[in-house]
């Protein structure tokens, strides 16, 4: 266990799905006394209340620093914005430039993320003389999971292990994880601080400030509205392909991922230095065929046995039924959500294009003593319960009753 000390965490990207969980968990894991300060850097200004993070005097949130800027300018802005930044001992790099922000240009997407990482690690190296550890979070594209041209040429060897060779060129030309890890390794030469890379696959979670970003939000809203319109016991079809329905993978909740990153950087900093680690809720592969029926039952629905071999256009159905959605929100006092095309696009991609088995091997992180484990698919129900409390979907007791359809038919 980590002793009480003067450790200070800096979370870059503190309101994203990963950074939010890291900032929250750093206040209590491995213990409440581990960090005397938890500093979150955000792209946009938000209050603690708006972020949904705990109201803890150790938590500090700052914005107004664009990591896409010139390194020298970023150094000046960080020093200006964050009091006593020199106290920082642990940096968690969870910032990310989206493909949509780069107008779908894959090369620009790669270059922007590499440049941000370069700026972040070198700025922290300059400003934080007490820095002990730097965590880089990447993902399973380190194995080519979302490199679709590559997947047409090869079959992934599962379970995916950290020792797997890199995706070869030209398929890896637009992947930025390798360049991120390489530049941190280079920056670390001759320095006292340590670093590691953490690789999750599908992250099942949300943040109060960005509900619509992860695909679990459009899924939950679609199923809630489908139940409202069609009534209890209605059969609902899996929206993706047959291959996607049956392929195996290992997802992770943000809290598990955050605690793993804290564990590696605090408890096993020597052993994890310079290494990459897979992380998931469990090493038991969980295909959609093991999750979809129980997810449907949560919403008072039954999973249809019919599965098409293409996207079922649930986004089109959603937009066509906005009148019913507004009625459902009014009836149950829900907070109306606006689903962006990006949210639906991410869901469509995950349910149609990724159609190979891709489960992760967790032997490496388990070997260092991080053994947190959760049942297959349980992360979805945790998110659904959060959505109920946030009044994004009707309560489960309502979904389990026949009243939704009766209300609609009376209107």
From Swiss-Prot:
Keywords: NADP, Oxidoreductase
Residue positions binding NADP(+): 105, 137, 249, 253
SUPFAM superfamilies in the cross-refs: NAD(P)-binding Rossmann-fold domains
UniProt KW Oxidoreductase keyword: yes
Known EC number: 1.1.1.-
Database matches in InterPro entries: NAD(P)-bd_dom_sf, PRISE-like_Rossmann-fold
Pfam families on file: PRISE (PF22917)
Family, per entry: Belongs to the short-chain dehydrogenases/reductases (SDR) family.
Name used for this protein in its record: Short chain dehydrogenase ausT
């Amino acid at each position: 266990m980590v002793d009480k000390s003067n450790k200070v965490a800096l979370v870059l990207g503190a309101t994203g799905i990963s950074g939010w969980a890291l900032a929250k968990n750093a206040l209590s894991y491995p213990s409440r006394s581990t960090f005397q300060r938890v500093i979150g850097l955000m792209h946009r200004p938000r209050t603690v209340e708006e972020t949904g993070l705990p109201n803890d005097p150790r938590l500090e949130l700052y914005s107004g620093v664009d990591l896409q800027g010139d390194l020298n300018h970023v150094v000046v802005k960080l020093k200006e914005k964050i009091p006593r930044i020199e106290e920082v001992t642990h940096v968690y790099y969870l910032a990310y430039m989206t493909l949509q922000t780069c107008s779908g240009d894959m090369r620009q997407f790669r270059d922007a993320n590499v440049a941000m990482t370069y700026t972040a690690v070198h700025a922290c190296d300059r400003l934080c003389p007490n820095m002990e550890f730097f965590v880089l979070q990447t993902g399973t594209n380190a194995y080519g999971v979302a490199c679709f041209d590559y997947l047409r040429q090869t079959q992934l060897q599962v379970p995916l292990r950290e020792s797997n060779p890199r995706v070869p060129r030209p398929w890896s030309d637009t992947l930025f994880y390798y360049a991120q890890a390489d530049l941190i390794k280079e920056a670390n030469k001759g320095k006292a601080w340590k670093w590691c890379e953490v690789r999750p696959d599908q992250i099942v979670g949300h943040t109060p400030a960005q509900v619509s970003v992860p695909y679990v939000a459009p899924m939950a809203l679609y199923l809630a509205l489908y139940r409202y319109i069609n009534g209890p016991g209605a059969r609902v079809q899996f929206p993706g392909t047959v291959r996607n329905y049956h392929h195996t993978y290992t997802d992770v909740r943000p809290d598990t991922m955050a605690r793993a990153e804290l564990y590696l950087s605090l408890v096993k900093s020597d052993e994890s230095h310079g290494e990459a680690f897979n992380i998931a809720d469990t090493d038991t592969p969980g295909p959609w065929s093991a999750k979809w029926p129980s997810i449907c039952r949560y919403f008072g629905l039954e999973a249809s046995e019919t599965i098409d071999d293409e996207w079922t256009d649930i986004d089109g159905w959603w937009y066509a039924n906005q009148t019913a959605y507004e009625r459902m929100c009014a009836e149950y006092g829900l907070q109306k959500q606006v689903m962006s095309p990006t949210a639906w696009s991410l869901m469509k991609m995950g349910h149609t294009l990724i159609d190979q088995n891709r489960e992760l091997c967790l032997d490496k992180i388990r070997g260092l003593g991080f053994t947190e484990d959760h049942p297959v698919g349980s992360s979805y129900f945790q998110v659904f319960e959060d959505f109920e409390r946030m009044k994004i979907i009707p309560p489960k007791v309502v979904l389990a009753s026949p009243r939704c359809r009766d209300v609609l038919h009376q209107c």
